[in-house]
Protein backbone atom coordinates (compact mmCIF):
# COMPACT_ATOMS: atom_id res chain seq x y z
CA UNK A 1 0.00 0.00 0.00
CA UNK A 2 2.77 2.44 0.94
CA UNK A 3 4.70 1.59 -2.22
CA UNK A 4 1.64 2.29 -4.40
CA UNK A 5 0.98 5.57 -2.58
CA UNK A 6 4.63 6.64 -2.88
CA UNK A 7 4.70 5.77 -6.57
CA UNK A 8 1.46 7.70 -7.19
CA UNK A 9 2.85 10.72 -5.36
CA UNK A 10 6.09 10.63 -7.38
CA UNK A 11 4.16 10.43 -10.65
CA UNK A 12 1.94 13.34 -9.61
CA UNK A 13 4.88 15.53 -8.56
CA UNK A 14 6.77 14.68 -11.74
CA UNK A 15 3.83 15.59 -13.96
CA UNK A 16 3.24 18.86 -12.09
CA UNK A 17 6.74 20.16 -12.75
CA UNK A 18 7.06 22.87 -15.38
CA UNK A 19 8.21 21.73 -18.78
CA UNK A 20 11.33 23.14 -20.36
CA UNK A 21 10.70 26.26 -22.47
CA UNK A 22 10.69 25.90 -26.24
CA UNK A 23 13.62 27.36 -28.16
CA UNK A 24 12.19 29.19 -31.15
CA UNK A 25 13.62 31.32 -33.96
CA UNK A 26 12.08 33.95 -36.17
CA UNK A 27 13.85 36.08 -38.76
CA UNK A 28 17.26 35.47 -37.16
CA UNK A 29 16.08 36.16 -33.60
CA UNK A 30 16.12 33.46 -30.92
CA UNK A 31 13.62 33.33 -28.10
CA UNK A 32 12.28 31.01 -25.42
CA UNK A 33 8.61 30.33 -24.91
CA UNK A 34 6.46 28.43 -22.49
CA UNK A 35 4.14 26.09 -24.40
CA UNK A 36 0.39 26.36 -23.76
CA UNK A 37 -1.15 23.45 -25.61
CA UNK A 38 -4.02 22.35 -23.37
CA UNK A 39 -7.27 24.24 -22.78
CA UNK A 40 -6.29 24.86 -19.13
CA UNK A 41 -2.83 26.18 -20.10
CA UNK A 42 -4.33 28.47 -22.75
CA UNK A 43 -6.97 29.77 -20.34
CA UNK A 44 -4.31 30.57 -17.73
CA UNK A 45 -1.89 32.09 -20.25
CA UNK A 46 0.25 34.81 -18.71
CA UNK A 47 -2.34 35.89 -16.11
CA UNK A 48 -0.76 37.34 -13.00
CA UNK A 49 2.71 37.68 -14.52
CA UNK A 50 4.38 40.95 -13.67
CA UNK A 51 7.33 40.61 -16.05
CA UNK A 52 8.76 38.60 -18.93
CA UNK A 53 12.45 38.26 -19.72
CA UNK A 54 13.52 40.21 -22.83
CA UNK A 55 13.35 37.33 -25.31
CA UNK A 56 10.76 35.16 -23.56
CA UNK A 57 7.08 34.59 -24.13
CA UNK A 58 4.32 32.02 -24.43
CA UNK A 59 3.37 29.99 -27.49
CA UNK A 60 -0.29 28.93 -27.64
CA UNK A 61 -1.24 25.94 -29.81
CA UNK A 62 -4.91 25.90 -30.72
CA UNK A 63 -6.86 22.73 -31.50
CA UNK A 64 -8.03 23.98 -34.86
CA UNK A 65 -6.96 26.44 -37.53
CA UNK A 66 -9.36 29.40 -37.46
CA UNK A 67 -9.47 33.01 -36.28
CA UNK A 68 -8.55 33.00 -32.58
CA UNK A 69 -9.21 35.60 -29.92
CA UNK A 70 -7.32 36.72 -26.80
CA UNK A 71 -7.96 39.01 -23.87
CA UNK A 72 -5.91 40.41 -21.00
CA UNK A 73 -8.03 39.65 -17.93
CA UNK A 74 -5.77 39.60 -14.86
CA UNK A 75 -2.69 40.16 -17.04
CA UNK A 76 -0.64 43.19 -15.88
CA UNK A 77 1.84 43.11 -18.80
CA UNK A 78 1.46 44.97 -22.10
CA UNK A 79 1.91 42.28 -24.76
CA UNK A 80 2.11 41.81 -28.50
CA UNK A 81 0.58 38.63 -29.91
CA UNK A 82 1.66 37.23 -33.26
CA UNK A 83 -0.58 34.68 -34.93
CA UNK A 84 0.90 31.92 -37.10
CA UNK A 85 -0.64 29.49 -39.56
CA UNK A 86 -0.17 25.73 -39.53
CA UNK A 87 2.98 26.24 -41.63
CA UNK A 88 4.53 28.62 -39.06
CA UNK A 89 4.07 31.73 -41.21
CA UNK A 90 3.11 34.91 -39.37
CA UNK A 91 -0.36 36.08 -40.42
CA UNK A 92 -1.14 38.89 -37.95
CA UNK A 93 0.22 40.84 -34.95
CA UNK A 94 -1.92 42.65 -32.38
CA UNK A 95 -1.01 44.71 -29.31
CA UNK A 96 -2.75 43.92 -26.02
CA UNK A 97 -3.10 46.30 -23.07
CA UNK A 98 -2.89 45.25 -19.39
CA UNK A 99 -6.13 44.16 -17.70
CA UNK A 100 -8.18 44.94 -20.83
CA UNK A 101 -11.14 42.57 -21.11
CA UNK A 102 -11.88 43.55 -24.72
CA UNK A 103 -11.64 40.43 -26.86
CA UNK A 104 -9.10 40.84 -29.70
CA UNK A 105 -9.03 38.41 -32.62
CA UNK A 106 -6.63 37.51 -35.39
CA UNK A 107 -7.60 38.83 -38.82
CA UNK A 108 -6.75 35.52 -40.46
CA UNK A 109 -6.96 31.84 -39.49
CA UNK A 110 -4.10 30.63 -37.27
CA UNK A 111 -2.89 27.53 -35.42
CA UNK A 112 -0.55 29.35 -33.01
CA UNK A 113 -0.24 32.63 -31.12
CA UNK A 114 3.03 33.84 -29.63
CA UNK A 115 2.75 36.42 -26.84
CA UNK A 116 5.83 38.56 -26.18
CA UNK A 117 6.51 41.88 -24.44
CA UNK A 118 4.67 44.63 -26.29
CA UNK A 119 6.67 45.94 -29.23
CA UNK A 120 8.95 42.88 -29.50
CA UNK A 121 7.92 42.11 -33.09
CA UNK A 122 7.87 45.76 -34.25
CA UNK A 123 11.30 46.52 -32.73
CA UNK A 124 12.77 43.65 -34.76
CA UNK A 125 10.79 44.52 -37.89
CA UNK A 126 9.13 41.10 -37.85
CA UNK A 127 5.95 41.14 -39.89
CA UNK A 128 3.56 39.12 -41.97
CA UNK A 129 5.17 36.20 -43.79
CA UNK A 130 8.03 35.66 -41.29
CA UNK A 131 8.44 31.99 -40.38
CA UNK A 132 8.54 30.75 -36.77
CA UNK A 133 10.97 27.81 -36.47
CA UNK A 134 11.17 25.30 -33.63
CA UNK A 135 7.45 24.67 -33.19
CA UNK A 136 6.96 21.13 -31.81
CA UNK A 137 5.61 18.63 -34.30
CA UNK A 138 2.28 17.27 -33.05
Task: Label every model-predicted segment.
Residues 19-138:
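Compact, glycine-rich, soluble single-domain proteins
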Residues 4-14:
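Bacterial N-terminal signal peptides
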Amino acid sequence: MRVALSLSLLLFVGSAQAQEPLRLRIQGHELQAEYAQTVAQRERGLMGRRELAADSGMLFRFDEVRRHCLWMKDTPLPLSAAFFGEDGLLVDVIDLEPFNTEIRCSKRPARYALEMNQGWFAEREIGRGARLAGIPVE
